[in-house]
């Protein structure tokens, strides 16, 4: 693994809620840019991000700009919107001291200069909780540690998912993407063809209404009988309310001696259990 798991834990997992909510909202501007300028696909993956470790950023797919393809993203440790071409950062906008509306206006100007459609005209097909700042400027001076830790959770999760998909035998996993609605980074393994195909989602959330901390999940479909659940590898447990899956929380992961190796073993073991139970 490339990620250094010993660097995680500087901030308790449950202490990332504010940073996560701010980053989640900030990341809606890049996805709006993608929706405005890319052809829609049925699974909505045109609107999703990839984790770019070199920038510690969630980045869109390439957008067809004048002069060459560009990407838009959020550099998580700084909560900074960036526009890149290749490996180069063309422009950046630090959100500290600025409102969400100002960030969107900045992006729209840059997109127009590049011959692209503005992000501000896009209406998202889902709702998010109210922006933590309302219409006030972002105050990030006291959130540097939390934003850095949030970025490390994304980086570590992406690394484990890459290791998992690289070693997966049999069915092919989908690309590893971060989804703008729920803000989770995940891959989907379809075990068969068809609209009601058996499948297993493997991913990581930075936290949500179910867990106020990052967690990793393995979600089989269709769900199992909750009364007859098999034992999971350490440190997992079954989550059955709201969604169904095997879960390892951030606290559980940090308590492991070998965090990266242990988490990969949990994900792989839970996947094998789910696949066997689904009969695939």
Residue ranges of predicted features:
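TerminUS-proximal long segments
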Residues: 1, 241-280
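Intrinsically disordered, low-complexity regulatory segments enriched in Ser/Thr/Pro
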Residues: 63-94, 206-254
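N-terminal ordered "arm"
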Residues: 2-69
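Short glycine-rich, low-complexity/disordered patches
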Residues: 35-44, 116-127, 166-183, 276-280
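Short loop/turn segments that flank or connect secondary-structure elements
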Residues: 112-113, 118-120, 140-144, 151, ...
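Long, hydrophobic/aromatic-enriched structural stretches that serve as scaffold segments
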Residues: 48-127
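Surface-exposed beta-loop interaction hotspot
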Residues: 118-171
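Secondary-shell segments that build the walls of catalytic and ion/ligand-binding clefts
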Residues: 154-230
């Amino acid at each position: 693994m490339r990620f250094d798991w010993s660097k995680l834990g500087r901030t308790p997992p449950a202490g990332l809620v504010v940073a996560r909510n701010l980053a989640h909202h900030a990341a809606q501007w890049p996805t709006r840019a993608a929706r405005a300028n890319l052809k829609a696909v049925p699974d909505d993956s045109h609107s999703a991000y990839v984790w770019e470790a070199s920038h510690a950023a969630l980045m869109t797919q390439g957008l067809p700009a004048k002069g060459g393809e560009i990407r838009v993203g959020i550099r998580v440790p700084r909560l900074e919107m960036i526009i890149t071409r290749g490996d180069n950062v063309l422009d950046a906008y630090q959100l500290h001291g600025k409102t969400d509306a100002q960030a969107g206006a900045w992006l729209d100007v840059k997109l127009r200069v590049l011959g692209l459609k503005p992000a501000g005209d896009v209406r998202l097909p889902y709702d998010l909780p109210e922006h933590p700042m309302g219409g006030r400027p972002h105050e990030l001076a006291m959130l540097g540690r939390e934003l850095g830790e949030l970025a490390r959770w994304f980086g570590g999760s992406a690394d484990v998912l890459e290791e998992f998909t690289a070693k997966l035998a049999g069915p092919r996993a989908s690309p590893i993407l971060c989804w703008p609605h729920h803000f989770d980074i995940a891959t989907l393994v379809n075990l068969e063809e068809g609209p009601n195909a058996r499948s297993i989602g493997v991913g990581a959330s930075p936290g949500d209404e179910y867990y106020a901390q990052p967690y990793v999940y393995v979600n089989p479909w269709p769900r199992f009988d909750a009364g007859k659940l098999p034992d999971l590898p350490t440190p997992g447990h079954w989550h059955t309310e709201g969604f169904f899956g095997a879960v390892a929380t951030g606290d559980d992961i940090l308590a492991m001696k070998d965090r990266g190796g242990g988490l990969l073993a949990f994900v792989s073991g839970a996947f094998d259990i789910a696949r066997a139970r689904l009969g695939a």
